[in-house]
Amino acid sequence: MVPTSKRLVGLAVLLGGLFGCATAGTRGQVGGASEGLADPPPRAGDPLVLIAMPPSATFQDVRRSLITEIQRDFNVSTLTVTSSTGMDEIGAAIARLSPSCIVLMNNTTVSLYREYQHAHPDTAKFPPSVVVMASFIDELRPTLINATGIAYEVPGVTAFVDLRSVIKAPVRKVGVVYRPSFRQFIARQKELAEKEQIELVAVEVGKGVYADRLRSSLHALLVEQKVDALWMLNDNELIKSSEYLDQTWRAELRNANVPLVVGVPNLVNPRTPLGSFAVVPDHEALGLQTANLIFELAENGWHAENHAVELPISIKTLADVKQLRAKFGLKDDALQHIDRALE
């Protein structure tokens, strides 16, 4: 049994293309991890947490703080996941290591574990999984057995209110495009936005979002609905590629004087302007929160399915200050509300 005090670690202090073939790693480690992903030396008899993740820097930030908090109570093994990683590699790691819990970072890793579960329907018990750094976990969770996690999406209203505190232009009406599978998510976001006197105007598109359909939907929001801002969901079908972004979002925003709120930091870049403002989880804090969740699951028999998906407890704001200042005006205290100002 993990001490209760461990569950609270870090909480008092605390209150957005992400994907090697398996190669030999350090002791207790699986997958093609670099030296920077070396796992702590294993101890006999301790339960093990398997971390399946892409090797990129943002994921390493989460992993680093997670391991710092759990390594005294758990052995840790890291499986690096890339575009060439297959379901069998996940299965081999589980068979060899018998993990007490699996941390799944990003949607590709979740898909691999789901494939593994579906390919072994007669398995009596799958290791519980904690999903982090993945889009729309509430929608993913029903497709997994014994899973919970921490949402990556910060509620839209949080971003809208933060944007409103930064720019002089009004933020009363925000437009969003979504696919049918996100209907319930959008309904929840509308309710939250109303509490802050912000109207969320939503346009539903088909399951497969063709560029012309997305562009016409964005045009309707900008020209007909005259929204004050646009919100881009963390949905791969709405982003797809740089070329797709050029044909859709950039094409419609080129002549529109509205900010674009995004949910991943790499879309806010003054050198290739697109996203104006982002509110994202603090990755170090996300690792600590993941550790806390693992301790809670350990104390409660690893019943992940009984634990609700959590919201991130610490967030950061990023802004293309050059764009915001030129197009929408910055309030006098704007920089006090921005954690990372880009120009």
Predicted regions, residues:
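Periplasmic-binding protein-like
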Residues: S98-N107, P128-V130, G175-V177, Q225-S241, ...
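Venus flytrap/periplasmic-binding-protein-like
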Residues: K125-L140, L245-P273
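An alpha-beta-alpha
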Residues: I51, L66, G149-E196, H303-Q323
